[in-house]
Amino acid sequence: MNHIQTFAEEQLKPDIPEFRPGDTVRVHVKVVEGERQRIQVFEGVVIRRRGGGVSETFTVRRVSYGVGVERTFPLHSPRVDRIEVVRLGRVRRARLYYLRKLRGKAARIRERKTK
């Protein structure tokens, strides 16, 4: 195995929960303000996951004060403190961009039942 692959595997976080598009997640992000560091929570629906390995990212969407806000997070970033899966969603697409056009009850996602 070459050096780049070994380095990339060392950077992978082992404690990432299993989640997919449609799931509602709570992402705890480390925010640095001057010398202070605090944790900011961003909760919303995962609308996509892309890439693989160290460069894998996921996008979370939520509506805040009537405005849709989307944030893309690198999955293995040291800034992402932890990810909690709040609710499992049942969707039939891998990219949920159609949620951008929907408002209110139309933007709801069915719940996935676990066995």
Curated annotation (Swiss-Prot):
Q: Source organism's superkingdom?
A: Bacteria
Q: Which GO terms describe its cellular component?
A: cytosolic large ribosomal subunit
- Note whether Ribonucleoprotein occurs among the keywords: yes
**GO-annotated molecular function:** structural constituent of ribosome
User: Sorted alphabetically, which Pfam families does this protein's record hold?
Assistant: Ribosomal_L19
Q: Which family does it belong to?
A: Belongs to the bacterial ribosomal protein bL19 family.
Q: Which PANTHER family match?
A: LARGE RIBOSOMAL SUBUNIT PROTEIN BL19M, RIBOSOMAL PROTEIN L19
Q: What protein name does the entry list? A: Large ribosomal subunit protein bL19
- Per the UniProt entry, what species is this protein from, by scientific name? Desulforudis audaxviator (strain MP104C)
